[in-house]
Structure formats: C-alpha cells, structure tokens
Regions:
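Long, charged amphipathic helices and adjacent flexible linkers at domain junctions
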Residues: 1-39, 162
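Electropositive phosphate-/nucleotide-binding environments in soluble metabolic enzymes
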Residues: 28-36, 57, 79, 103-111
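Phosphate-interacting basic helix/loop segments used at nucleotide- and nucleic-acid interfaces
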Residues: 33-47, 109-124, 128
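Acidic/histidine-rich
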Residues: 46-67
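Structural motif
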Residues: 48-51, 70-73, 92-94, 128-131, ...
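Nucleotide-binding motor/catalytic cores of P-loop/tubulin-like NTPases across gene-expression machines
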Residues: 59-61, 67-107
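C-terminal binding/interaction regions
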Residues: 115-138, 144-156
Length: 162
C-alpha cells in the first residue's frame, strides 16, 4: 500500500519541481555544487546510477536530499556509516572491505565503483553510464570535489559514441 502511494507521488511530473520549491538557500560549498552537478549530469547522460565514495556519509546524504532520478550507491569503508545510509532515500550502501580501495589509484576506484554497481544490480548493461563522486583527500568529511562519468564496463573502455 505505502509503495503504491510513494510510486504515485514520485511519479507525478511536478514532483521534482514541488520539492525544489521548498529548498532553502543553496549551500555555496564545492561539495554541494558537485552533488547538484552529479544529479544534473545523471539526468543529461541518462546514467543509471550515482556512485558516491564516502567515509562519513555526508556526500551520499546530501545526494539523497536532492532526490535524483537514479539510485545512489554509497561505498564506504565504515560499516556503521553504511548501515546509517541504508535509511537515506534512494541510497544503496556497500561496505568496502579493508584494502579493496586504493585511494591513490583513482582509475582503480572507478573500476571498483563499476564492479559494485553491476554486482548490486543497479546497472545491467556494460554500456550503462554511471556518475561517480568522490572527495580528495579521501576521508575528509564533506570534501566531495570530483565528479566523473564512466561506463559500467569500466574507465578503460570509454567509447566516444556513448
């Protein structure tokens, strides 16, 4: 019953406009700009998911507040934060095993994001696009400062026709 109500409300063509009418003044930080850009980029390129690398969860929570049209995969090395993020709208948390993410290898992080999105079923086709957000230095709360578009097949398989 609740799912039907949610689907009907969120399916209304004026839903996004209605939500935005209640938004307070925009946060002027770089992290806020990255989140807004990720949502718009996802819509523009038809991305199937937004992947957010996060330690404290603030980036994924900010993205959730903006209600993007696609699911948010929050990858965190902190299990407690991942559990908390499970309560955020549209967020699918994943706990990265210790050592599975080399924060000095951004291409490796992008590959990990693609593999995880495929494994979680958020994308199904290798040509599906994913928008990835991260903050460097990694682990700094609220430091989202990178947004990247990558095909689900990985960062080394970019095809200009995509």
């Amino acid at each position: 019953m609740q799912q039907r109500i949610i689907n009907r409300v969120e399916g209304d063509p004026h839903y996004q406009q209605y939500l935005q009418s209640f938004e307070p003044e925009h946060d002027q930080s770089a992290a806020a700009a990255i989140i807004l850009a990720a949502r718009q980029i996802a819509r523009t390129v038809g991305a199937k998911a937004i992947v957010s690398f996060t330690v404290g969860g603030s980036t994924a929570q900010r993205a959730s507040k903006k209600r993007p049209d696609v699911p948010i995969l929050a990858i965190s090395p902190v299990e407690e934060k991942a559990r908390q993020l499970a309560l955020s709208w549209g967020v699918y948390p994943d706990v990265a095993a210790p050592g599975s993410i080399d924060t000095d290898d951004f291409r490796g992080m992008l590959s990990f994001a693609c593999e995880t999105a495929l494994a979680k079923g958020l994308v199904s086709d290798p040509n599906d696009m994913i928008v990835v957000t991260a903050g460097f230095p990694f682990g700094t709360p609220g430091a989202a400062n990178i947004v990247r578009v990558v095909p689900a097949s990985g960062p080394t398989t970019w095809d200009a026709s995509l």
